From Swiss-Prot:
InterPro entries per UniProt: rRNA_ssu_MeTfrase_G, SAM-dependent_MTases_sf
UniProt keyword terms in alphabetical order: Cytoplasm, Methyltransferase, rRNA processing, S-adenosyl-L-methionine, Transferase
Family of this protein: Belongs to the methyltransferase superfamily. RNA methyltransferase RsmG family.
Protein name listed in UniProt: Ribosomal RNA small subunit methyltransferase G
Function: Specifically methylates the N7 position of guanine in position 527 of 16S rRNA.
Catalysed conversion reaction: guanosine(527) in 16S rRNA + S-adenosyl-L-methionine = N(7)-methylguanosine(527) in 16S rRNA + S-adenosyl-L-homocysteine
Residues at which S-adenosyl-L-methionine binds: G74, L79, V125, E126, R140
Pfam families: GidB (PF02527)
Cellular compartments per GO CC: cytosol
Origin superkingdom: Bacteria
SUPFAM superfamilies (alphabetical): S-adenosyl-L-methionine-dependent methyltransferases
Organism: Shewanella loihica (strain ATCC BAA-1088 / PV-4)
Main location: cytoplasm
């Protein structure tokens, strides 16, 4: 049932996936549903809704990512980082979260699904100092783009971008970019079977 739905959703989004990638996405949903009962990783309980609200919602950002090295800040159980890593095996993803139970889940997913292009880090974002900066800083965890830029300003390369996955947009929020940052793109995302506004904001540090 879920496999057929995944095929349909990928087709709707004009995405192609190998049989291995499809199985990894489905296995990730199964692990999330199983671990969620004990670890309370997400408020979404139904696997069909997990597929829509977590997997497809994460993948909607995929066509807009530029670069090879990304960090997913406040990733929780690995969202959007793990679905994006599965579908972009040529890119590297660091998954950052401050809660140990979420990191344990991510590492188990990495082990069981043999995902070679993710690494999990347990840290608060302001305390994390990577040896190498990132092409893209991703998050769907922050309430406002201002918060994201304040907490994550030290993470991208000079040529890197911030990617914020958002729902409904506030004109005030978009107009009030912190000093030193420029909003370059607002992408309207279409997620199958999700009748809600979804957007991806791309922000760069001003030169």
């Amino acid at each position: 049932m879920l496999a057929a739905q995944l095929d349909s959703y990928l087709a709707d989004m004009q995405m192609t996936a190998t049989p291995k990638q499809k199985q990894q996405l489905l296995d990730f949903v199964a692990m999330l549903a199983k671990w969620n009962k004990a670890y309370n990783l997400t408020s979404v309980r139904d696997p069909e809704q997990m597929l829509i609200r977590h997997i497809m919602d994460s993948l909607a950002a995929s066509p807009h990512l530029v670069g090879e090295r990304f960090i997913d800040v406040g990733t929780g159980p690995g969202l959007p980082g793990i679905p994006l890593a599965i579908m972009n095996p040529d890119k590297e993803f660091v998954l950052l979260d401050s809660l140990g139970k979420r990191i344990r889940f991510q590492k188990q997913v990495q082990f069981e699904l043999a995902i070679g292009n993710i690494s999990s880090v347990e840290s608060r974002v302001e305390a994390y100092q990577p040896e190498e900066k990132f092409d893209g800083v991703l998050s769907r965890a922050f309430a406002s783009i201002q918060d994201m830029l304040q907490w994550c300003h030290h993470l991208p390369k000079p040529t890197g971008c911030f990617y914020a996955l958002k729902g409904q947009l506030s004109d005030e929020e978009m107009a009030n970019m912190p000093e030193g940052f420029t909003l370059t793109d607002v992408f309207e995302l279409k997620v199958p079977r999700l009748d809600e506004q979804r957007h991806l904001l791309r922000v760069v540090k001003a030169a």
